[in-house]
Swiss-Prot record:
The chain crosses the membrane at residues 25-43. The modification Phosphoserine is found at residues 54, 57, 181. This is Membrane-associated progesterone receptor component 1. GO terms for molecular function: amyloid-beta binding; heme binding; metal ion binding; protein homodimerization activity; steroid binding. Detected in urine (at protein level). Expressed by endometrial glands and stroma (at protein level). Widely expressed, with highest expression in liver and kidney. The lineage of its organism: Eukaryota, Metazoa, Chordata, Craniata, Vertebrata. Non-classical progesterone receptors involved in extranuclear signaling are classified in 2 groups: the class II progestin and adipoQ receptor (PAQR) family (also called mPRs) (PAQR5, PAQR6, PAQR7, PAQR8 and PAQR9) and the b5-like heme/steroid-binding protein family (also called MAPRs) (PGRMC1, PGRMC2, NENF and CYB5D2). Gene3D superfamilies: Cytochrome b5-like heme/steroid binding domain (3.10.120.10).
Length: 195
């Protein structure tokens, strides 16, 4: 009966016997694409579970730094934490100082927002300006920002409060630093740990 089907369809019996299926797979571009995709996915499934050998990647992150104790900073003290002089990266936003070290790719020396590292980034974030000249070296009271810029700054502050460790506040000239106890942790951070 199989021979009758071959004769009825007009196919050459030698084509079916000599790898007709393989011939069809390798002559159709769509089938080749699907075969390549299957091989790639199989490779990723099998190879993806194996950890990369140490030293293979240039993107190796340095080991995480210990959590910084809460303290307050003057603008001059903050400048040291730019990722170059000190491996830790701190930024001030709206008077609050955040440890953004885990965001080194963004805020580190080579990152797109590296200009803000070790500085009060409030004015730059509020005005969407990445120029170093827009940032002040002394305490910036931000009194000249518009209502829209203040709202933008508040949004940035909320994002940083949610994502990064709040380590203290930025001190005005002549302002005394707050003395924090070792057990003290802000309410927003303890709530974040419960998530």
């Amino acid at each position: 009966m199989a021979a009758e089907d071959v004769v009825a369809t007009g196919a050459d019996p030698s084509d079916l016997e000599s790898g007709g299926l393989l011939h069809e797979i390798f002559t159709s571009p769509l089938n080749l694409l699907l075969l390549g995709l299957c091989i790639f996915l199989l490779y990723k499934i099998v190879r993806g579970d194996q950890p990369a050998a140490s030293g293979d990647s240039d993107d190796d992150e340095p080991p995480p730094l210990p959590r910084l104790k809460r303290r307050d900073f003057t603008p001059a003290e903050l400048r040291r934490f730019d990722g170059v002089q000190d491996p830790r990266i701190l930024m001030a936003i709206n008077g609050k100082v955040f440890d953004v070290t885990k965001g080194r790719k963004f805020y580190g020396p080579e990152g797109p927002y590296g200009v803000f590292a070790g500085r009060d980034a409030s004015r730059g974030l509020a005005t969407f300006c990445l120029d170093k000249e827009a940032l002040k070296d002394e305490y910036d009271d931000l009194s000249d920002l518009t209502a829209a810029q203040q709202e933008t700054l508040s949004d940035w502050e909320s994002q940083f409060t949610f994502k990064y460790h709040h380590v203290g506040k930025l001190l005005k000239e002549g302002e005394e630093p707050t003395v924090y106890s070792d057990e003290e942790e802000p309410k927003d951070e303890s709530a974040r740990k419960n998530d």
